[in-house]
């Protein structure tokens, strides 16, 4: 089935916005570290790689899925994306971006008290913003149960979180409390790039997340494959490729993303072997095309993300586990310097 012309046009527009968000966020960090005057010589930082892994998801969320009553807690390390989006929406100024992480500039992490743009939740300490969305949703239900604000539409309380934020104990306390109180209208979107400050995430962790959330009454949506990968899986030999992707360790996948198409080709052919149709699937693509296919994880595919968001037509809590690449779209994607 061919996509409708309007859908294709919308995706093209969103792709252009995604490119602008990634560029602005990366430029903001680069300017703070390498262009702006630095009198003490200290590194400013800014988490370019962590921002890049969420650029697609945040583009889909802010420019397609959000409703006026929704509120969002942005993971701290994606603050540059947030400021870039607010700039494109006319709610942030260029001088604030140029003074990112400086006095009276855009803040390192979204702040309701210090930022000029439209911050819903301060998320300066990892894990706290995530829990805030859950308790805000419970508070919304409490207020409505007492007869206040019923004329206003209900909002979804949405958290954008890094996979390593799920190491924070307060998150699990919140999940338990949500189950006790009948949590509704809460989305948690996990940026599953499988890298943290000092490590690659343990294999199979997503399955434990999935079981945990489902046991506490959440729906779980895993967004693993992008449109290119899904189309390739439908080709002869595609199922073998999908099985290889599912078996591939996180550390190896990260290394191959950085090494590029020739490395992908060698590893795939060495491990899958000459099996006719799947070999043809690989060999008919150039190195550039093969790298694009293998890097096309669900969290970087606008169509896949939008399908996941649009597919929710209920008020049950939802956890989206979106596979992403740290530093996606930047030269140092998955280079192994996990905290760059």
Residue ranges and their predicted role:
Residues 5-7, 192-339:
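Long, well-ordered, tryptophan-enriched scaffold segments
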Residues 71-75, 185-193:
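Short internal beta-strands
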Residues 155, 182-186, 217:
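Short glycine-/polar-rich loops that comprise or flank the Walker A/P-loop
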Residues 9, 13-21, 25, 29-39, ...:
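Cofactor-binding active-site loop characterized by glycine-rich and histidine/acidic residues
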